[in-house]
From Swiss-Prot:
The gene is upp. 5-phospho-alpha-D-ribose 1-diphosphate binds at R79, R104, D131, P132, M133, L134, A135, T136, G137, G138, S139, D200. One of its GO terms (molecular function) is magnesium ion binding. Catalyzes the conversion of uracil and 5-phospho-alpha-D-ribose 1-diphosphate (PRPP) to UMP and diphosphate. It catalyses: UMP + diphosphate = 5-phospho-alpha-D-ribose 1-diphosphate + uracil. One of its GO terms (biological process) is uracil salvage. Its EC number is 2.4.2.9. It holds the Pfam family UPRTase. SUPFAM superfamilies: PRTase-like (SSF53271). Gene3D superfamilies: 3.40.50.2020. It comes from Finegoldia magna (strain ATCC 29328 / DSM 20472 / WAL 2508) (Peptostreptococcus magnus). This is Uracil phosphoribosyltransferase. Keywords: Allosteric enzyme, Glycosyltransferase, GTP-binding, Magnesium, Nucleotide-binding, Transferase.
């Protein structure tokens, strides 16, 4: 079974509280999503391997450590996932970015794919899938399945808020995918929205309804 990491860092909790507030405007909402993504990135990359290298400082030579040739990919689930990309790229500037467009059918609550663009060598990369919300888990499950069909083997899922139902879905379908969430909420309501949640992340990011 995959590992689920729920963050308890004070900065993340503080920013998440402001993010939830219905009075937080789109500009601040976008900034907070990016900042939370950056903070989460440190834990998501904790298991990255390092290799020794020699570096010369202005004073003398020393042995340092760098990431050991790891090729990375950040894949947002459109459209809300776009809000987390810059936060990850600020820490991982060499990562390539792919895009998977999914929307949730309001009647069936199942994901429908409408767009996909991935790096040519995506199967060689460790992939970080980002989406602010993990509700039913349908979109995340579909995106991960799609990536595996393209040869991806090492995949992590990063969400700002998740419902237990979504985590259960992903763990059942993809027990090899570790999940990282900033906040684990109570449940889904009858409309498939996370409670208490933060509303529609895409609408709040981009100022749409």
């Amino acid at each position: 079974m995959s590992k689920v990491t729920v963050f308890d860092h004070p900065l993340i909790k503080h920013k998440l509280t402001i993010l939830r507030d219905k009075n937080t405007g789109s500009n601040q909402f976008r900034q907070l999503v990016s900042e939370i993504a950056t903070l989460m990135c440190y834990e998501v990359t904790r298991d990255f391997k390092l290799e020794d290298c020699e570096v010369e400082t202005p004073i003398g030579k020393t042995t340092g450590q760098t990431l050991s040739g790891k090729k990375l990919g950040v894949v947002p689930i459109l459209r809300a996932g776009l809000g987390m990309v810059e936060g990850f790229l600020s820490v991982l500037p060499a990562a390539k970015v792919g895009h998977i467009g999914l929307y949730r059918d309001p009647k069936t609550l199942k994901p429908v794919e409408y767009y996909c663009k991935l790096p040519k060598d995506v199967e060689e990369r460790d992939i970080i899938v980002v989406d602010p919300m993990l509700a039913t888990g349908g979109s995340a499950e579909a995106a991960i399945t799609f990536l595996k069909e393209h040869g991806c083997k090492n995949i992590k899922l990063v969400n700002i808020i998740a419902a237990p139902e979504g985590i259960k879905m992903v763990q059942e379908k993809h027990p090899d995918v570790d999940i990282y969430v900033a906040g684990l909420d109570e449940k889904l309501n009858d409309h498939g929205y996370i409670v208490p949640g933060l509303g529609d992340a895409g609408d709040r990011l981009f100022g749409t309804k």
